[in-house]
């Protein structure tokens, strides 16, 4: 059984539990530095890492897919690379639906496979903290709803590394409405005045398939359930109930039956994400509808130019 992230991680100020775990955060940070290895660099393929500092729910996979779409439009042969995790088959399937995916327990092995297949660009979904690979382009993703939570590193908070490490990064991508991002952008610029900030929000691609007079029950096991529900409400769907499960949750028949029973109580149709739908492969999905979404990037031209220039570099 997979647990949800602790609620105190997303409090705006550290709680008693955060301070209680602070010594472990310090120890974990020291271990990470000690285990750091020389980074692998190569000239045979360009590497882009779409990663995060806040753990989970920042839109990495969606941005990786968007980058692949942009490269495809410009006739640049790109693939995806994702470290293999048995509990993240949903993301692996989603990436595979949108291009060639190389997945291995070691990212460097997957990268060498991509090189042998003649790809020009490798897009890493996650791996920002992988100390073995030197990326040509790194993009740090955040979600406006959670931002950095209580601002502390694991396990005291939700951060994989200190937020001040943004000083060493060149690119940030923010998920959310522009109005909600103003304060976050100001905080980022105070840390690194020269950092490039782009932003975007999720848009549903098949929203016209849904009757807006109908009741809907929403369920998901993704990093940021609230973002998904907010998107549906912004598109005028009548959400009467929503069920949140842990990220990458593997649904049992019992879970599935409970979802069906809850929907019947509200006389509601059932909606989930494409990721969750892919995890229901062994269950009867006839009563489940999924929303296919994409990222609408505020300055796609800027991102496109950056990607083209990257590929042109020797």
From Swiss-Prot:
Protein keywords: ATP-binding, Kinase, Lipid A biosynthesis, Lipid biosynthesis, Lipid metabolism, Nucleotide-binding, Transferase
Signal sequence extent: none
One CC-aspect GO term: plasma membrane
EC id: 2.7.1.130
InterPro entries: LpxK
GO molecular-function terms, A-Z: ATP binding; tetraacyldisaccharide 4'-kinase activity
Source taxon at top rank: Bacteria
A GO BP entry: lipopolysaccharide core region biosynthetic process
Pfam families: LpxK
Pathway this chain belongs to: Glycolipid biosynthesis; lipid IV(A) biosynthesis; lipid IV(A) from (3R)-3-hydroxytetradecanoyl-[acyl-carrier-protein] and UDP-N-acetyl-alpha-D-glucosamine: step 6/6
Catalytic activity: a lipid A disaccharide + ATP = a lipid IVA + ADP + H(+)
Biological role: Transfers the gamma-phosphate of ATP to the 4'-position of a tetraacyldisaccharide 1-phosphate intermediate (termed DS-1-P) to form tetraacyldisaccharide 1,4'-bis-phosphate (lipid IVA).
Name the UniProt record assigns to this protein: Tetraacyldisaccharide 4'-kinase
Organism: Pelagibacter ubique (strain HTCC1062)
Gene behind the chain: lpxK
């Amino acid at each position: 059984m997979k647990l949800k992230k602790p609620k105190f991680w997303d409090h705006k100020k550290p709680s008693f539990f955060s301070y209680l775990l602070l010594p472990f955060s310090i120890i974990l940070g020291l271990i990470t530095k000690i285990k750091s290895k020389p980074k692998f660099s190569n000239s045979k393929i360009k590497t882009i890492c779409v990663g995060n500092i806040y753990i989970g729910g920042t839109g990495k996979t969606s941005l990786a897919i968007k980058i692949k779409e942009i490269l495809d439009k410009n006739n640049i042969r790109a693939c995806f690379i994702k470290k293999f995790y048995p509990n993240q088959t949903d993301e692996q399937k989603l990436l595979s639906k949108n291009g060639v995916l190389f997945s291995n327990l070691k990212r460097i092995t997957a990268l060498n496979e991509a090189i042998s297949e003649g790809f020009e660009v490798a897009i890493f979904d996650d791996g920002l903290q992988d100390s073995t690979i030197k990326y040509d382009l790194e993009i740090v993703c955040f979600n406006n709803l959670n931002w950095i939570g209580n601002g502390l590193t694991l396990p005291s908070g939700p951060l994989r590394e200190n937020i001040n490490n943004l000083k060493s990064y060149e690119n940030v991508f923010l998920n959310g409405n522009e109005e909600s991002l103003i304060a976050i952008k100001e905080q980022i610029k105070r840390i690194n005045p020269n950092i490039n900030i782009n932003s975007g929000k999720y848009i549903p691609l098949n929203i016209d398939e849904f009757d807006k007079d109908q009741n809907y029950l929403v369920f998901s096991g993704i990093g940021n359930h609230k973002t998904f529900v907010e998107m549906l409400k912004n598109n005028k769907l009548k959400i009467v109930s929503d069920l949140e499960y842990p990220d990458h949750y593997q649904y049992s028949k019992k879970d599935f039956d409970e979802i069906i029973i809850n929907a019947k109580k509200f006389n509601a149709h059932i909606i989930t994400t494409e990721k969750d739908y892919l995890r229901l492969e062994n269950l009867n999905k006839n009563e489940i509808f999924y929303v296919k979404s994409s990222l609408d990037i505020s300055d796609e031209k800027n991102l496109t130019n950056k990607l083209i220039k990257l590929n042109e570099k020797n």
